[in-house]
Curated annotation (Swiss-Prot):
Matches recorded under InterPro entries: Aldolase_TIM, TIM_sf, TrioseP_Isoase_bac/euk, Triosephosphate_isomerase, Triosephosphate_isomerase_AS
Location(s) in or outside the cell: Cytoplasm
HAMAP family: TIM_B
EC number(s) per entry: 5.3.1.1
NCBIfam families: tim (TIGR00419)
A single MF term (Gene Ontology): triose-phosphate isomerase activity
Keywords, in A-Z order: Cytoplasm, Gluconeogenesis, Glycolysis, Isomerase
Name the UniProt record assigns to this protein: Triosephosphate isomerase
PANTHER family: TRIOSEPHOSPHATE ISOMERASE (PTHR21139:SF42)
Family per similarity comment: Belongs to the triosephosphate isomerase family.
Organism from which the protein derives: Mesomycoplasma flocculare
Subunit: Homodimer.
Amino acid sequence: MKKIIIGNWKMNKTVHETRDFIQKFDIFYSKNLGKIKDNLDFAIAPSFTSLALISTSKIDKLKVAAQNLSQFDSGAFTGEISAKMLQDLAVHYVIIGHSERREIFKEIGEDLTNKILQAQKYNLIPVFCVGESLSEFEANETEKVIIGQINEVKSVLNFEKAIIAYEPIWAIGTGKTATAQIAEQVCKLIKNNFGKNIRVIYGGSVNSKNINELLLQKNIDGALVGKASLDPEEFVKILANI
């Protein structure tokens, strides 16, 4: 199964800063071309304002990902961005269910289900995020939480095409990383319960120093990278260290 790396920029980088990133990324990538495996997929999820710029990269393999989408198809929904609009911008992947969306914007199962349906309708690949809080982790409730989150959407999610991203909330942007063994255990849990051929990736303080150990695990098929993906040189190092 192909490994995949997706950079999630969150609410960072202006259009000008994105142009600068792409120029530097192209240079660093070309210099490290011999170190990057041919069977590696990779994408960047910038803010909506910079989506079109990712496609200006000279590196054809770099795909465009979106951080969110509307649960509605079109119409009077001020401020929303539809799946059709994303498709028109050559978006390949879309992140759904990130813990920040669940916690800050109170997205629940019904919202996520509708977003998945919209993504799949327009041939976008959902990157469905699951993860437990620190208190849930310490209470040994990880399995219950992860299985429960996937069960909420399993009736509509096309597991053969979708990606499941395991991101323990306690490891997002904290500098804390689940050990490779913990990440492997949860990714294996997901595959055992929902299908061996599902693409399952890990997210949570991933960088060029820990990416190799993480992806050496049998059931981890890639990574969702946050802060480290904002630096073009570091992002290329991640790709080269797999």
